[in-house]
Amino acid sequence: MAQNHMSETMNDISAESPDQPEPPRTGYGVIQAYLKTLDSSPGVYRMLDHESRVLYVGKARNLRARVSNYTRPGHTQRIETMISQTSRMMFLTTRTETEALLLEQNLIKQLKPKYNVLLRDDKSFPYIMVSKNHAFPQLKKHRGARKGKASFFGPFASAGAVNRTLNQLQKAFLLRNCTDTMFENRTRPCLQYQIKRCSGPCVGKISQADYADSVRDAERFLAGRSTKIQEELGAEMQAASEAMEYERAAALRDRIKALTQVQSAQGINPRGVSEADIIGLHLENGLACVQVFFIRANQNWGNQDFYPRVAEDMSAAEVMEAFIGQFYDNKDVPRQLILSDDIENADLMAVALSEKARRKVEIVVPQRGEKTELVASAVRNARESLARRMSESATQAKLLRGIADAFGLEAPPNRIEVYDNSHIQGTNAVGGMIVMGPEGFMKNAYRKFNIKDGEVIAGDDFGMMKAVLNRRFSRLLKEDPDRQKGMWPDLLLIDGGAGQVSAVAEIMEEHGVQDIPMVGVAKGVDRDHGKEEFYRPGENAFALQRNDPVLYFIQRMRDEAHRFAIGTHRAKRAKSLVANPLDDIPGVGARRKKALLTHFGSAKAVSRANLSDLKAVDGVSDALAETIYNYFQVR
């Protein structure tokens, strides 16, 4: 709407004006000549080359002042080159600077100027739609215009995020996903009903009033009232269990589990942010990645990465401002944008976006609290995504050759093993090994090493690494002593510095396998990506060039090892924190435990069951039922 309004107020005062003197061919003289025609109006300017290709689009609160800046010295090499290529300029005046900002971003997307930040991936995002034009509303994925009798929830970052959420919502609320035509022509329940994904409204398996209650609960969940709904379902489940309505209790338990899985899949779940996009930026060596998390109704509906075209001398503020302007040119704007970096025209951008959204839009760069943590997560994702993109830009073979060159190997390695440990003050300690080969990560070769209490001194990182490598090579020597089965590494990468490398070298010497090359990978003094130091036994530390693709490749392997190790550690820690009393009963293994929980809904319900109810469970003998009953009676 703002763009159409602006078109009525613009004046083109380009070089074709008959009273304007003929400017020199290119460069500073061209720009100097145009200054004579400009006033202090706000507007947008375009710089064009001798073939009328647009080099740059900019906006200004004062066109004359802004353009005059180009005639002064002190520009970067990129700007100097752009000026030298400029042979013509065009100007469009606007009534306000806000209009100029909106027009600038629109023209950049249309014209794709060579010297502007350019968002190349301009995709739309899907929503969840609950139809309202039917007695039994449908739940489905939706793209495109949001109109008609329906409720829309989103946006979601990807179709996958929508599909996963829909899958769990159908388990929880049993809402139909069939078309109206299919609904009207059903004579018996479909497969969705059989697998408990639909309540069967098409054949009268549920009343319209009860179905409407399920729709209401689904909408409440999507609108951010998930905790309240889960509390209500939990109370219903408890009441059903106490009334010995075990089938209903089990169904309610499954609904709670499905809703919990929706939340756990969301990763970050902010408590104090109801509607916002969290935008994190990472710039490195002339490349950029922007990560956007979509927060709606206090829920994280996924994240998406973008790779705008940038130049190496562009600042984070410049890239962030350009991204925001272009990204929201054709998308709904949330009530709040939470940014990792300040932008120069934050107030102006907020006004422009507020006009577009027809409500207040706030732009914030948090300095502390939960929002700071959310932004840090977005930046971390952006950094990791950029690292993956850079490492994938070269072929795997080329990267492996680069590894060989960097570390003085005789040939590119076919198998690289990367090791990392994870623990909290020595508790639940684990080691992780990931493997990289000619075709990428070899996930079927990953291994985890549980470090038992007493095996090493708590918190002794060197001792943990020695324990892991001792186990690894003891097994290799036993299973493949002749190194003929492709199980032996061509290179070891150790997460750590000189101390870890020395510890590993001791183990290698003890096992007589000193011929296997090893390198320690340690972050630099300020622990920044790009400043890693590398250690080999008995040698001084060395580094690689920050823009070397091999460095990104190593970072990617090191980060994957860290992810694998810390994930294993968290699983081990979670298991130790959540002890199920059924695990301690003699004769109750995984199969019978599952049967008991399925039948009663929870371990607490099992503990309250009488003997006859326990005997009724499939797979539980009379003797085992008595054992279970007696176990809980004496507790």
Curated annotation (Swiss-Prot):
CDD domains named among the record's database cross-references: GIY-YIG_UvrC_Cho (cd10434)
UniProtKB keywords: Cytoplasm, DNA damage, DNA excision, DNA repair, Excision nuclease, SOS response
Polar residues: compositionally biased ranges: 1-14
Domain of life: Bacteria
Metal-binding listed as a keyword: no
Region of interest: Disordered: 1-27
Ranges of residues in domain GIY-YIG: 40-117
Pfam families linked: GIY-YIG, HHH_2, UVR, UvrC_RNaseH, UvrC_RNaseH_dom
GO molecular function: DNA binding; excinuclease ABC activity
Cellular compartment(s): Cytoplasm
Record flagged with keyword Glycoprotein: no
Domain UVR, first and last residues per copy: 227-262
GO cellular component: cytoplasm; excinuclease repair complex
A biological process from GO: nucleotide-excision repair
Protein family: Belongs to the UvrC family.
Function recorded in the entry: The UvrABC repair system catalyzes the recognition and processing of DNA lesions. UvrC both incises the 5' and 3' sides of the lesion. The N-terminal half is responsible for the 3' incision and the C-terminal half is responsible for the 5' incision.
Subunit-structure text: Interacts with UvrB in an incision complex.
PANTHER family membership: UVRABC SYSTEM PROTEIN C, UVRC/OXIDOREDUCTASE
Protein name in UniProt: UvrABC system protein C
Organism in which the protein naturally occurs: Ruegeria sp. (strain TM1040)
